[in-house]
Structures are given as C-alpha cells and as structure tokens.
Amino acid sequence: MAMARRSASRLLSSFRPFSLLLQPLDDAPSLSAAAAAASARRGMSSASALRARDEKEVARWRESMDRMRNIGISAHIDSGKTTLTERVLYYTGRIHEIHEVRGRDGVGAKMDSMDLEREKGITIQSAATYCTWNGYQVNIIDTPGHVDFTIEVERALRVLDGAILVLCSVGGVQSQSITVDRQMRRYEIPRVAFINKLDRMGADPWKVLNQARSKLRHHNAAVQVPIGLEEEFEGLVDLVELKAYKFEGGSGQNVVASDVPSNMQDLVMEKRRELIEVVSEVDDQLAEAFLNDEPIQANQLKAAIRRATVARKFIPVYMGSAFKNKGVQPLLDGVLDYLPCPMEVESYALDQNKSEEKVLLAGTPAEPLVALAFKLEEGRFGQLTYLRIYDGVIRKGDFIYNVNTGKKIKVPRLVRMHSNEMEDIQEAHAGQIVAVFGVDCASGDTFTDGSVKYTMTSMNVPEPVMSLAVSPISKDSGGQFSKALNRFQKEDPTFRVGLDPESGETIISGMGELHLDIYVERIRREYKVDAKVGKPRVNFRETITQRAEFDYLHKKQSGGQGQYGRVCGYIEPLPSESDGKFEFDNMIIGQAIPSNFIPAIEKGFKEACNSGSLIGHPVENIRIVLTDGASHAVDSSELAFKLASIYAFRQCYAAARPVILEPVMKVELKVPTEFQGTVTGDMNKRKGIIVGNDQEGDDTVVVCHVPLNNMFGYSTALRSMTQGKGEFSMEYLEHNTVSQDVQMQLVNTYKASRGTE
C-alpha cells in the first residue's frame, strides 16, 4: 500500500509542477495529475467514466477532489485543538470573530456547540466543518482529547485522509498523544504535527520533537524554526522557502514575510540540513540529489516532503501558538502541500456477494455510490447521519440502499455541517463528508445505489470499563428517561444500557466516570429528567484457566410437551493470542444431535457466558467444544437443547478453575518533584505497578498500571497530596487477573448481595 501511495505521489510530481497546488481555483488544469495517476492505479478507464457521466462533469469532479483535504485535529486534552480550529475558521473566513474555548465571553468556540462543552472547556463530541484556503476545500473534524471520549476519535479517523497531531510545547508527548497516534497508525493516516503553545513559560519545541521520535516512533523533522520562545515568541522561519514570517494585526491575520534574521542564519541552515537528511532517508529522489551534493531547491524539497508524508514515511513538524494567533496560516499551507487528496488514499470495501472479498474502491464520482455512516446525532429535524462518500454521487431525493439492513431509503435532505449549523446542498460526490436527515440506520452501516453490495470495514470499538445504576426520580419521567438512553446508546457505541437481573436496576456502562457523568447531565438538561445515580462499578469479567468436561442430560417427560436433550464435550480457555472472546466448535461425527439443534446449543452456551457463577459478570476468552450428545425423536426441541447447554455450562464451570479479571488502567502522573515520594507511595497502596519515571524540569512524570477499582476519587486525593499542583490522565490498558484475596472478597460480596452463603 505504501508503495502504491508513493507511486501516485511520484506521478504527481512528474506530471505537474508543484507550484500549481497554490494556484487560484480558476487557473487550475481541468484534470490534475494526482487524479489521473490515482485513476490509472485503480485501473479505471476513461470509457467507463464516460458511460457513467458526461466527460466535462467527470473532469470537474476530479478537479474538485484534487483540491480537497479531509483532515482531523487530534491531541491530548488541553493541547489546544479547538483553539487551533477556531483560528483556522477565522483565517479562512468561515467565522468573523474569534471566541475562546471556555466561553468566558458568553459565546465559546464555534466547534464546541454544546453548553456542557463550553462550561467545562473540553470537547465532548467530534464536530465537523469545512472551509476554503487558497482555492482548496478543507473538511475538518475536531475531536475530543479526553480518553473517555476516544470513540469520537476512532470514528473520525476512520473516514479521514489526513490529520494534524497537536502537541503541547510544555507538556510534550502525553498519554493521550500516544493513544491518538496509535489510532492514526491503525487507520494508516498520513499526518503533520503542530507543536502548540510556544508562548507558554517552559516551551521547548526541540524537546517535544525528540519525544515524538522516541515515544511515538515518528520519523520527523521540523519544517520551521521559531523566532524566540515564551514571551519573546515573535514568528517563524520556513526551512523550505528560507523566509521569516511574522503575524501582525489584531488577530494575527496579516502574515508579513522577510529575510531570515542574521542572528539565526546558522541555526536555520543546521535545521534545514537536518530536514533534508531525514527526508532523504525515505525518499530516493531527494537522497540522490543530497548524496551528489546538489543544491536542494525549495520546490524539490517540498515535493519530496509530500511524497514521504503521503506514503506515511515522514511527519513534518510545524510550530506556533494558536492562542496568540501565530503559525496557523503556514500550518494550513502545510495541509495543502503535504496531506493527500481523497484520490491518493486507498480505501477498501468488502463484497458481500463474494464472501466478503476485499475490494479496492476507485474513489471517483463515476463509480456506483458507496458511503459509510460514521456518526449519528439527534437533530431538531430528526436523526442526523454523517456520511463519508467513498465512491459515486449522492443527490437529494435519491433512493439509496442500506447494505447492512437491506432497506431502501429516500434521501429527503442533504446538508454540509459547520459545527451545529447546516447548509443545504443538492448533491455530494466521492471524497466529501456530508450529513443526511431522515435516514434510519446505525453507526457503521454502508449505503450504496443498489448496483453493488459492498460494506466498509468496521472501526475499532473499545469495551466499556465502568458502570452506574441510574433511575428516574419521578416515575412519570420513565418515558423520557428511556427515550434518552435509547438515543445515546444509538449515537455512541461505547455507551451501553443493560438491566441488573438481581435488582432490576438500569445499568449504564461507559469508558469512565466523566463519560457517564456527562450522559447523566445530558439526561437532566436535554430531557428534563432528574436521575438517581448509584456508586460507580467496575466492569469485571470472568474467565477459566483449565479444561473441564461436561455431560448433561436435560429431561422432562412428566406430562405435557416433553423436553429431551443431552450435550457432551468440554470447555477450555482460548489461547492468549486469540482475538475472540467466545468460540463454539461442533466436533460431533454423525447425527447424535440433528444439525438443526446445533444453533440452539451455541445460543445456550452464549447465554450462559453472560453471567459467570463467581460474581455474575460475563465470561470471556472461552472455547466450547461439542463432541457428543443424544436426542429424542419426539421430545427434543431447540428449547430443550438450549436449556441443556446452559445447565451443562453451570455444571462444569467450577471445575475449570474460574478467575475474575479486572480492568487495569495506564495512569500518567505529573507532579512537582517534591511530592514524588508521597504520590508513588500512594500508588503502591492502590496496588499500582510503577513502569516509568522521568524528570521534566521541576516535575516528575510517573507512569504506572493500576486496577481501576482502586482509582475512584483519585482526583481529590491527588489535589490533596500535591497542594493542587499535580495532574494525571488515565486510559484503559487491559483486563488482568485479580489476586486471590481480592477474588475471595468479590465473591463473598456477590453472595451476600444475593442472600446466599
């Protein structure tokens, strides 16, 4: 895939001067080399395109796609993502005033449209918008930085072609920076980095750049050098063009170019040489010129950076201060210069007519429609479904087919989003991100025009780690309460709703305390329902550690319809490298059990695994093998075999030596060094394992693995231990076996709650 991307990029640089990337839209060629190269790579003939659309229309669409960028802005919490997006919208003319994140002026940042986001100063939902820069359309998704809302990052990256990874020049590479970068790597996203907050006390961009190399394994180099730091930060020197830029005017809207300051000449040439060396390591064309000691021209270096970035072999590093309105315009230029257009990105679908055979999509408007629903929202006019179009065209009034459900749906309204505002459009084509109203579907569904039966590969959805019991205080609010839970569960795949079989309470599960607190607050605000909330619960799991046999006969033949079903086999733990949580294998030879009863047996075992006998939590990492059984010509039924399976599982479960698994969190602490001993001592009491300890100036950064069950109320405890100077972040790491004493305590608590010994 990387070679294909690099080939496309080289074709681009061979057939079209790079300076055309910055030409006004009217001066652009009718068919870009990037689009032509991508079409050739996918084997798309001009004849097939002409059959689908008028030649001029196809050329117009291709030109539009070549001048399009679909990007996300992601980072650790409080790194300045939304502030950066606000400046991008201002400089591109999408908004006419700059407002700050926390809404101190009563307005708040454009992309934080929820009241809760403006009050708390954090992004909770990803928000989409679009803008125009130098004749290019840039579609942007601003994502949350808090780990509890990681699904918003997952689904944004699933549909994007490029990304900006924002890093704090003071905090450096933090825990969520690592998580976000891992997500970008999973979805093979080319990216540029932006080291923000150069105006802050303690800013050190070179330290952060080196951290990205060591902690994120980035093959990177700076494309800019800052003119001053902290209070003396004035502007930037472009290492490609060898020009200095300062940002003047009340909001930094005037970019003034000048020569490189004389006192920076040596540093600039040193950093430019480093940039050329790093790019030469992954780009043959530049390496050849560099090894021959040829002078490297700006357009030559720019083309090499683009080839390497699109091929995901290099990450250019930009710098600035979004809050101080410095460095944003050059970053926008970098998005156009170095991140791919939709036709340079390879996207795959699964052909349902060919046993989910992997298909490379053409990525052009001339092909049949293929679009992915990646996000749902409840709008004022019904369900709002966000779509990324990979192939074809969608028009208002079209009939489209949901491949996952088989339903035919008419598109009543088609819009482009600008945060919480909408702009009606008549059509949208491949490469675009739009939204439709009135289309009932689930997140992850694929839509086509009916001529193909493709589904897009699914995104990664993490399992919830924490639960709460909730109930409406007023019985009259039950309807609205249920409506809220149904809506939120549909919109957010990491938000789950269930019923406690013992108490009958409604249980909501999510990614952490903040995640669940936000939903409880939204129920109160948006549905006017006050809810009673129980104590947070950890989502434990159960598993087995050894093989155990089962042989169970379920027999009921005392009047009425009889029941008869016998199942024999064994249960065993799945190998540690297995991705699945449950496997069922039918190893019966012959017809001891008629084949039509096998699905009922599997269903019975699955149902039994929903509640283990230790503490009533789901059982995972288990393989069930059916080896023999017996049936009755009259009394055997699906129900009989399902019940036989459930009882067989309960019969052999204890013999398989079950254990309890608990969620373990990766916790990163940053505290003044004077409090290091106190904080690490407290972590040891919480049964944390220290795995890292680094010094950053006057602060110590401690990384540890801690059971989630021991982390409740930690924010208050940390403030108390560090006089309010400590901070921490936490993300899910894995489920791990609890100690024997903890298991005994959990089992006894569970038995006491059920009134059993």
Swiss-Prot record:
HAMAP family: EF_G_EF_2_B. NCBIfam families: EF-G, PRK12740.1-5, small_GTP. Pfam families: EFG_C, EFG_III, EFG_IV, GTP_EFTU, GTP_EFTU_D2. Keywords: Elongation factor, GTP-binding, Mitochondrion, Nucleotide-binding, Protein biosynthesis. It comes from the Eukaryota. Coiled coil: none annotated. One of its GO terms (biological process) is mitochondrial translational elongation. One of its GO terms (molecular function) is translation elongation factor activity. Mitochondrial GTPase that catalyzes the GTP-dependent ribosomal translocation step during translation elongation. During this step, the ribosome changes from the pre-translocational (PRE) to the post-translocational (POST) state as the newly formed A-site-bound peptidyl-tRNA and P-site-bound deacylated tRNA move to the P and E sites, respectively. Catalyzes the coordinated movement of the two tRNA molecules, the mRNA and conformational changes in the ribosome. This is Elongation factor G, mitochondrial. It is found in: Mitochondrion. Its main location: mitochondrion. Pathway: Protein biosynthesis; polypeptide chain elongation. InterPro entries: EFG_II, EFG_III, EFG_III/V, EFG_IV, EFG_V, EFG_V-like, EFTu-like_2, G_TR_CS. Residues 66-344 form the tr-type G domain. It comes from Oryza sativa subsp. japonica (Rice). Belongs to the TRAFAC class translation factor GTPase superfamily. Classic translation factor GTPase family. EF-G/EF-2 subfamily. GO terms for cellular component: mitochondrion.
